[in-house]
Amino acid sequence: MKFELQVTDKASDARTGIITTDHGQIKTPIFMPVGTVGSVKGVHFEELRQQVKAQIILGNTYHLYLRPGLEVIKAAGGLHGFNGWDRPILTDSGGFQVFSLTGIRKLREEGCEFRSHIDGSKHIFTPENVMDTERIIGADIMMAFDECPPGQSDFQYAKKSLEMTQRWLDRCVKRFNETEPLYGYQQSLFPIVQGCTFPELRREAAKYVADKGADGNAIGGLAVGESTEVMYEMIEVVNEILPKDKPRYLMGVGTPQNILEAIERGVDMFDCVMPTRNGRNAMLFTYNGTMNMRNKKWEMDFSPVDPDGCDIDRITTKAYLHHLFKAQELLAMQIASIHNLAFYLRLVTDARQHIEQGDFVQWKNSIIDQLGQRI
């Protein structure tokens, strides 16, 4: 993987770049649709390519490991061969999912023992077998296995957790370097900066991660209950230290406003389930604010969902989409999910354009309040 830093904004830390992988290029800033089990909920890959303009998607190691399982994925030639997506893929290590299984997992130095949410069977994730699993899945970008402490952890717990994450990172790097890709194309490993909301720990973590010299670096453990002000502060603290010549990935974030604020602070890559999850619940993101398509106000509105949006937005009226949601038609959730994902991709593409034009901060400031309105 190669990262070419192109333009850095003169008024902020926003920047543009190009990530080159063996499955294609990714223009940053970029939003990555979440395809947890190898698919993006409600959206066919052809729609992801043509309507959403997705350049890279996510898969989740925990879910893919449990179902369909590594035997199936390996026999198919990796996740690309299994699901037919021919562009880059990033896999989360599954750490967040495993540590979300409160009451059905046990944490120790070796790794994390857990029970499947599907059938209750026992499993263990270690840094070594997670690297092996991600090799079998075959994503272009693999995430290191880390502990994801609760958002409101106290300093002592957060420090202890970070120390374990750093030891696990060393084991991940060692295993990654000892193994080879299985399918003839390059894979990259991204370490993850943890440290909860403690600047001291975030600085320590960022320095530790930066010293690994990885192809890219991630910021984890944010948007888990802390205020947006604290989240932005942690991003600033970390990005002062992470190398500028490597892509920076903010995991699991967030709203359109969060994304623009993080771009201003030097983040390049984003993922979040919000576009599809909110879409399935009739909430549409637009530059004018958020629309609840179940509201009666749209019943007689025959204007397009978004006249400046993707093809589906332009041919679908608000009244028709309102009707589909009221009738509980599956098509409603599909259209809304496509719209939201396309909007997120449009947002980061527009951000890229304004960084290139040199007016990113003015543009961001002119739209950010409206993005948060309910209409």
Which residues make up each language-model segment?
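C-terminal extensions of enzymes
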Residues: 1-20, 26-33, 41-42, 146-152, ...
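Non-catalytic, usually N-terminal nucleic-acid engagement modules in DNA/RNA processing proteins
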Residues: 1-182, 296-298
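A non-catalytic, amphipathic alpha-helix used as a structural packing/dimerization or gating element
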Residues: 129, 133-136, 160, 164-171, ...
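Glycine-rich phosphate/ribose-binding loops and adjacent secondary-structure elements
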Residues: 163-166, 175, 179, 184-305
